[in-house]
Amino acid sequence: MTWRKSYERWKQTEHLDLELKERLIELEGDEQALEDCFYKDLEFGTGGMRGEIGAGTNRMNIYTVRKASAGFAAYISKQGEEAKKRGVVIAYDSRHKSPEFAMEAAKTLATQGIQTYVFDELRPTPELSFAVRQLNAYGGIVVTASHNPPEYNGYKVYGDDGGQLPPKEADIVIEQVNAIENELTITVDEENKLKEKGLIKIIGEDIDKVYTEKLTSISVHPELSEEVDVKVVFTPLHGTANKPVRRGLEALGYKNVTVVKEQELPDSNFSTVTSPNPEEHAAFEYAIKLGEEQNADILIATDPDADRLGIAVKNDQGKYTVLTGNQTGALLLHYLLSEKKKQGILPDNGVVLKTIVTSEIGRAVASSFGLDTIDTLTGFKFIGEKIKEYEASGQYTFQFGYEESYGYLIGDFARDKDAIQAALLAVEVCAFYKKQGMSLYEALINLFNEYGFYREGLKSLTLKGKQGAEQIEAILASFRQNPPQKMAGKQVVTAEDYAVSKRTLLTESKEEAIDLPKSNVLKYFLEDGSWFCLRPSGTEPKVKFYFAVKGSSLEDSEKRLAVLSEDVMKTVDEIVESTAK
C-alpha cells in the first residue's frame, strides 16, 4: 500500500481520534511530512517499538499501540487459558501520552480476555520487571522511550521471568503484530467496563513496598549509614526514579540526600536538559552546581525510565567528574566481591555477566576473586536470558551484570538493568570508602593501580538516507573482507565476526566458534590487549565504534586511547570517502 492510500484510509475513518484528526488537518498539503507519517508501519522489533508521537502508521499513537498490543495478545492467547489468567503487568514513564498509551495497551489485552495490571502512576522500568515476577504474570509492557528526545515514545515487551523477551520469543510476537493489516479496525471495550469485569486491575503501593524491601537486601554493609554521613545529591532528570530512590535510601538509613529541585518532578519536555541521559555529561549541570554548594560526596543521576545510572565524584583537583559506565561498574563489582568474600558469602560458582563491548577490567576483577565472567551480546535482555539459563541449570550463581552504557543489575529479583539498585549500592560504596578516609575517585585510582589503567571510548558515525545505509554496509564489508593487520602501530591478533559466530586467531591461522546468537558486530584485538569493535545501530542510521586500551598510568591509557580511536576512524573515513564518489 502506498503512503497516500494509508493516509486516505486514516483521513476517511469516521471515528478517528479527534486529536489525531486535527493533526492530519494541520499537515494537509505538506506532502513530505505526510509521507514520513505514512510511508511505512512503525517497526516492532526485538526490543519492541519506538518512534515520534503523532498521526500515521509510522508514529506512536493509540492505533499503533493497539496494533502492538493485539499482536502480544495473540501471542499470549496461543499459550492457553493459564497464560491469559496470569496476565500482563503494564508500567509507564513521564513522557507525553505515556499514561494514555499504557491504558490503551491494557484495554486491548483485556478485551481479548487477558488479565492486566496497570500501575497507578509512572514507575521505573526495573520495577515493572520485578512486578512481573512478584505477581507471577505471563508478561509485561513498559511504555517508555528511555532517554530519547521528548517527541518520542516507545513500547517494550517482557516475558514471564521479568526479562525483555529474548529474540526467539520476540520473533513470534513480531510475526503476530505484522499479521495485523489495519490498526484502525482493532476494537477495544471501555475502560470502566473492563475494570468492572476485573480484567483491568490498578496496582501500586503494595508492589512498591515489596520492591523497596528487596532493594535493601542488596546492601552488604547496612550499618554504614549509621557510621558515616554521606552527602548525596540526586537528580531523576524529570523521570520515574524520584520516589523509589528516595524511598530506598531512606530505608537504608541515608538521610543526607538533596534532590535537584529543578529536575525533581516529572516533565514530559525534560525542560532543563538537552538530553535526559546520564551518559551525557551535560545532564549533570544542575547536580554539579548543587553538589558544589553542598560539598556533596557523590552525585547520582538516573534516566527517565530509571534503568541507567550515572555518578559523578570529585577528582584529585576537587572538581566533579562523571565516571564512565565501565568505571562505575568496576567500583560496584569490586566492592561486592571483596566484601562478600570477607563475610564468607561469595559463592564458589559465582558469575559476572557483561556485554562484549564492556571493559575487560570487570573480568580482571572477577578473576582475582576466582569468579568467571561470561560475555553476552549488547543489550541487557541477553544478560537476563543468561541469568534465567543459570538459574535453571545451577551451573553458576549470578553476582553482578553490567554494560558500559550505564546499566547495572545486582539483585536478580529484577531482570533488567536497575538504576535504583545501582544508586543505592553506589551510595553504600561511597560510604564504605569515606569511612576509610577515601573518595570514590581515589578508590577508582587504587583499582587501576591494582588491575591496570583500563580506558574506553565510544564514537558514533551517523550516515543518513539510502547512501548512508550503503556506506555503513561498505564500512563493515571492508573490515570483514580485509581485516586490518595493524592498528595504532600494534598487530591485530584476533578477529571476531559475530554475524557468522567465528573467532579467527590471525597469528595462528586458527578458527574458533563463538557461542552467542548471530549479530552484525565485528571486534578486533591487538597484541597489547587493546581492542575495538564496530556495531551498526538496529534503530538509527548510525554505526558505533567502541575502543578499549590498558595503560601503565592515566596519561598513558588516555594517549593509547587517542591513538587507537584516531587510527580506526581514519580507516573508516577513507572507506566512506571512497564510497561517496
Swiss-Prot record:
Gene3D superfamilies assigned to the protein according to its UniProt record, in alphabetical order: Alpha-D-Glucose-1,6-Bisphosphate, subunit A, domain 3, Alpha-D-phosphohexomutase, C-terminal domain
Enzyme class: isomerase
Cofactor note text: Binds 1 Mg(2+) ion per subunit.
EC number: 5.4.2.2
Named cofactor requirement(s): Mg(2+)
InterPro entries membership: A-D-PHexomutase_a/b/a-I, A-D-PHexomutase_a/b/a-I/II/III, A-D-PHexomutase_a/b/a-II, A-D-PHexomutase_a/b/a-III, A-D-PHexomutase_C, A-D-PHexomutase_C_sf, A-D-PHexomutase_CS, Alpha-D-phosphohexomutase_SF
Effect upon mutating residue 240 to I: Impaired enzymatic activity. Great decrease in biofilm formation. Deformed cell morphology
Annotated pathway: Glycolipid metabolism; diglucosyl-diacylglycerol biosynthesis
GO biological process, one term: enterobacterial common antigen biosynthetic process
Catalyzed chemical reaction(s): alpha-D-glucose 1-phosphate = alpha-D-glucose 6-phosphate
Active site: 146
CDD domains reported for this sequence: PGM2
One Pfam family in the UniProt entry: PGM_PMM_IV
Binding positions (Mg(2+)): 146, 303, 305, 307
Main function: Catalyzes the interconversion between glucose-6-phosphate and alpha-glucose-1-phosphate. This is the first step in the biosynthesis of diglucosyl-diacylglycerol (Glc2-DAG), i.e. the predominant glycolipid found in B.subtilis membrane, which is also used as a membrane anchor for lipoteichoic acid (LTA). Has a role in the biosynthesis of all phosphate-containing envelope polymers, since glucose-1-phosphate is the precursor of UDP-glucose, which serves as a glucosyl donor not only for the biosynthesis of LTA but also for wall teichoic acids (WTAs). Is required for biofilm formation.
Database matches in PANTHER family: PHOSPHOGLUCOMUTASE 2B-RELATED (PTHR45745:SF1), PHOSPHOMANNOMUTASE 45A (PTHR45745)
Protein family (similarity comment): Belongs to the phosphohexose mutase family.
Identification of the protein by name: Phosphoglucomutase
